[in-house]
Amino acid sequence: YADATANADIMADRSRHIIMRYLAAQEAVSDWANTAAYCPARFADGTLRSAQARHTARLMAARLTINIAQPTLSRCDGIDSFDIDADSLSAMSVAEDQSGFAMEVFAARSIGHATLDISDRHKTTSQRLISFSGAEDTRAKTYDVAQLLAHPDTIVDSATGLFAPTDAVIEMNCARSEIAAVESSSNSTSDSAQSRTTAENSSDDSRQQSLGILTSMIADRVDLALTWGYPSFDEALFE
């Protein structure tokens, strides 16, 4: 956490040379992701700030004429399981399914930045999450998008009251729902006991690995929303 805040301060300091700020932003991406993974109480803060640092680094890279990859939604590729409870994984699968459906509808109408590939990535992630959960599949598969279609370009984000591009709000709402699901997970908290058995330490390692994967996955959604024009200042991202 200390490294994350230090690099974030350098990143935001306009009196510093842009190269120093760019390098600090890159470091902040991983520092904040590690904060989310190793300190569950800071999962939301770490995930959102990691995505914010990604976005800042990308903007600085453009000014420095450095080629940097555009955000791509991860799909839990190569993952066998998550040490997160079934209810939380199920809730995340619903969030991905909703976003996938909305993106499919938008792509069919050539609205915003939506593509069928983005829709498929959401839906693939949704299917994998519900499979990992082992829970009953409660996904509706189709959802009411009338409000989104009534405001295809910009819409008021109900979470902040701010106007933002509609496709970006879809991605941001997906991320917020997933963060809430992880934070409510019965497996996401750690105790402060001084004595640890090997099994307990192994369990902690498993949770940290799971949270690390999830923070990166969710940050992808936030990063994409920011790239599409969702406000990146703190008041828009943090409660």
Predicted regions and their residues:
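All-alpha RGS (Regulator of G-protein Signaling) helical domain and cognate RGS-like helical scaffolds
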Residues: Y1-E239
